Amino acid sequence: MNFKYIIAVSFLIASAYARSEEYDIQSLSQRDVLEEESLRKIRGIGSAILSAGKSIIKGLAKGLAEHFGKRTAEDHEVMKRLEAAMRDLDSLDYPEEASERETRGFNQEEKEKRIIGPVLGLVGKALGGLLG
């Protein structure tokens, strides 16, 4: 008789343990589902914040490019003069024919006087415009 009770009690204990394991598995799966939902919400919020940040940065970059990218007619003229002066400076470096070398000293001094003064002024204006 005691043997029957021992078997019955152990059967009840085993079935109770099996039910508790089943409930634990269900609660874990429910917890996993809830965690997954909360992670999806967090990811959604994060992606929304990230896209808003990207939009803000793109807007700022576009605004800065428009603001600093605009050249007035005066700036354009200054740049044209600067380019012409640079071409003149480059022409000083080219070798000349022997017949032209006699007048080279005079011509070079004239070119340097004509170029260096305006170039310094243009560079000063350009730097002042960029920094100002």
From Swiss-Prot:
Main location: secreted
Recorded coiled-coil stretches: none
PTM sites of type Phenylalanine amide: F68
Leader sequence residues: 1-18
Propeptide: 19-42, 72-112
GO cellular component terms given for this protein: extracellular region
Residues where Leucine amide is found: L131
Alphabetical list of InterPro entries matching this protein: Bombinin (IPR007962)
Keyword Secreted: yes
Localization in the cell: Secreted
Keyword Signal: yes
Keywords of the record: Amidation, Amphibian defense peptide, Antibiotic, Antimicrobial, Cleavage on pair of basic residues, Cytolysis, Fungicide, Hemolysis, Secreted, Signal
Any Pfam family: Bombinin
Expression (tissue specificity): Expressed by the skin glands.
Protein family: Belongs to the bombinin family.
Name this protein carries in UniProt: Bombinin-like peptides
This protein's encoding gene: BLP8-BH9
